[in-house]
Amino acid sequence: DHQVDPRRLCGAILEFLGDRVVPTRASEVLFNEDHRAIGLRGANGKSYRADHVVLAAGVDTGAITGIPQALTDLLRPVRGEVLRLRVPEALRPLVTRTIRGVVQGNAVYIVPRADGTIVLGATTREDDMVGVRAEGVHQLLRDAHRLVPGILDCEIYEMTAKARPGSPDDVPMVGRVGDGLTVSMGYFRHGILLAAIGSRIGADIVCGTEKDNNPALLAAVNPFRFGNR
């Protein structure tokens, strides 16, 4: 597989956008008297006007006032451990391409980076533990060792367990949900992989050209496909 570093990609996008990025969290969708979305209120208390509002706030989307609850109730946080390891100089390159495998029913991926580090992931769990679960770390190292034994000689320099936004069928929810209001959420484990197509659909909706997309694709990601309108 080809691969991209999500952190470097996001950093590059922010750098490209420059001062067009407002460093605050959205707290409320603003509507006019006709109930058309006209902007957002940030956590900093300031209001930001927009011709069309696109919400892509991940698992925190439900915390934004003004989104139909029938939509936000469908999102659930799915946590999972990811390890980042540094390969010793003597073992480089430990792997030269992305490895995906299934070990005793558990999916595992090993992604090499150009700087000699490796991303190892990812577990999936739906519980209340916010931090890194020891069982998840053990599972990842055990399964990765079956695929690449040298993984145990690497240095663990970071462990994370972030919440990913899952929909009922684990497929994104992208579409217009009100006049001037579009959501793009529920990307689950594949946010970076589906970012290009998700942003394309969102942009087409804003520009009024969504009909140029495959109807089956639009139906597959329709936020109201669960009968929740």
Feature annotation, model-predicted:
Residues 36-38, 117-118, 181-182:
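Hydrophobic residues embedded in beta-strands of well-ordered beta-sheets
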